[in-house]
Amino acid sequence: MGCCGCGSEEGSVRQWKPLEQRSCTDVLWLLIFVLFCIGMAIICGFAIASGAAQRLVFGYDSYGNICGHKNTEIKDVTMSGLDHTDKKYVFFFEPCNWDMVHLKILSVALCVTKCPDMDLKTLEDVRNFAKYNGSRLCLYNLDPTQYTSKNSKSCPILPVKSSKPIPFFHRCVPMDSGCKINFKALTTFVSYNSVLQRVITGVMTSKEIIVGLCLMSLVLSILLMVIIRYISKVLVWILAILTIIGSIGGTAVLWWLYADHKKTLKLDPSQGDVAADNVTALLVCAIIATVITVILLLLMLIMRKRVALTIALFHVAGKVFIHIPFLIFQSLWTFLALAFFWIYWIAVLLLLATAGYPQKKDQGYVEFKVSGPLQYTWIYHLVGLIWISEFILACQQMTIAGAVVTYYFTRDKHNLPATPILASMCRLIKYHLGTVAKGSFIITLIKIPQMILVYIHSQLKGKENACAKCMLKACMCCLWCLEKCLLYLNRNAYIATSINGTSFCTSAKDAIVILVENAMRVAAINTVGDFVLFLGKLLIVLVTGFVGIILLNYQRDYTVWVLPLIIICLFAFFVSHCFLSIYEMVVDVLFLCFAVDCKHNDGSPGREYYMDKSLMEFMDESRKAMRSVTGSGAEMKSMASGSDNA
């Protein structure tokens, strides 16, 4: 009996070999995934059918009328059902009065023919604007001649700031930058923490630097991907030395900037809170950088003897990239697919926020609300975000696995398909989408409790006792560890499926058996490969962060350091991880293929190895490396059960 309720697919011992004649795997899960996606489409259709798309794009007034359209009357709502064909823009009486909790403007909204393009300081200015531009800014039941102090409550709050419409969304946005940034609700939200308010301002003023450095990290990641293909002993040491110099140099610069900012603040205390925040942020960053540098130096001391092993590993992986160069761009296609889906998801979320049916409020205005079970569609939509995102990432892993498996088990590399990546992708779509759907759903089941615990933790912050806090964090830690283990298991299950064409559960079981049989060698390879890739990621973060520090240092008068710098470094790490994780996947595929190769072949006529000489030499070196760590008396288990033909 197979795992997860799956029956065993074969009564005999598993014959590991790449099957040309494949069959569809996990069809039931593919059907479930398709039905789930249909549900996502139905939610989108409901939002559009209820008028949410029109209300989102064209906007609507406080009486439920959609701007730029001829509207139907809403029962018991005065001034509804108006013809606003020539009134295409939404104008707010109090555009800066935001409710950040419910994400809406607490203001009367009207449809107008033109946004005020000048400051209107008096009601006479409002009246003249209506007279000469035909755009009435007071309630619909008032004639411009009635724009007097007697009817001031039916007119916008004075002064009316000049505004312009948002492209494609037809809302009048005030040109006053202070109004854009300092929303009343946002000010209320951060009023208890003025530091947060200054940090938000710092991010807004540093947005060009943040975007520029994020693009820089993308270029550095692609460049490092190309360099690793041709890695040698010299390049490994250069990478290590550059990382060490970058860590020490970056730490020294942070301490120097901290001392400089502190001295400047002491000489001129009038610089205010922004300068004090910068000093505090620099101190925190300097301490963190110091700790990271010390840990890095210790790791380099421990790993220095494995440089030769590292070179051999990346020489082997580099050959794969030479024969399948489009592997380098696989992360780019995945990123584009994720970006497209996330844009769609956010658009539907915005549609859901404006979906529903009109309900009359006490003031006589209209609010659109969803009642009954439909009000919980956002939960379904949130699960869709996790599952489909994980599905896309799993498709990348299966595609890479299929291409590398084809490379490994093709004896004559000149007979490889013209485009192994495309061939692997077609094989995935034709046979194994159900397996990918099942694997990604398992990760989704772990992420949902994680999100619930994070939400509970944020809601109980400052209220929970020490015991509850400890238990909550322990649960979050356990789920995090479980997620990492399942991600690793999923990755190897996809590799096994690429080799044998078996279902997810069968592939996972077979992969576990192989990994357990070769646990020591797995540890050696993962330690060596992951460490070098970590150095590469760290180097990109250090270079990007260092340039960010230098640039932000010239904006010390109005920019708080901490959040812009964190955003830059996190994005740099995310981008570098996305690209360099391809190498991790390639190494994992090569290892599992090697283990299967050794288990079923011994080099004799008719049972020749698929591996090339360089891979065999690397595996022998990895065995020696682990033997030196475990001691001369700890002999590694043979790759082939019951034989010693590794």
Swiss-Prot record:
Residues the record marks as carrying a glycan:
133, 278
**Any ranges marked Extracellular in the topology annotation, and which?**
49-207, 255-281, 330-331, 395-435, 552-559
Superkingdom of this protein's organism: Eukaryota
Q: Which reaction does it catalyse?
A: choline(out) + n H(+)(in) = choline(in) + n H(+)(out); ethanolamine(out) + n H(+)(in) = ethanolamine(in) + n H(+)(out)
How does the record say this protein sits in the membrane? Multi-pass membrane protein
Spell out the subcellular localization from the entry.
Answer: Cell membrane; Mitochondrion outer membrane
An example GO CC term for this entry is: mitochondrial outer membrane
**Could you tell me the Gene Ontology terms of the biological process aspect for this record?**
choline transport; ethanolamine transport
Tissue-wise expression: Present in myelinated structures from brain and spinal cord (at protein level).
Q: What Pfam families does this protein map onto? A: Choline_transpo (PF04515)
Q: Where are the transmembrane segments?
A: 28-48, 208-228, 234-254, 282-302, 309-329, 332-352, 374-394, 436-456, 531-551, 560-580
GO-annotated molecular function: antiporter activity; choline transmembrane transporter activity; ethanolamine transmembrane transporter activity
Its chief place of residence is membrane
Question: Topological domains (Cytoplasmic): residue ranges?
Answer: 1-27, 229-233, 303-308, 353-373, 457-530, 581-646
Keywords on record? Antiport, Cell membrane, Glycoprotein, Lipoprotein, Membrane, Mitochondrion, Mitochondrion outer membrane, Myristate, Phosphoprotein, Transmembrane, Transmembrane helix, Transport
Q: Give the similarity note.
A: Belongs to the CTL (choline transporter-like) family.
Instruction: Name the job this protein performs.
Output: Probable choline transporter. May be involved in membrane synthesis and myelin production.
- Please report the name of this protein according to its UniProt entry: Choline transporter-like protein 1
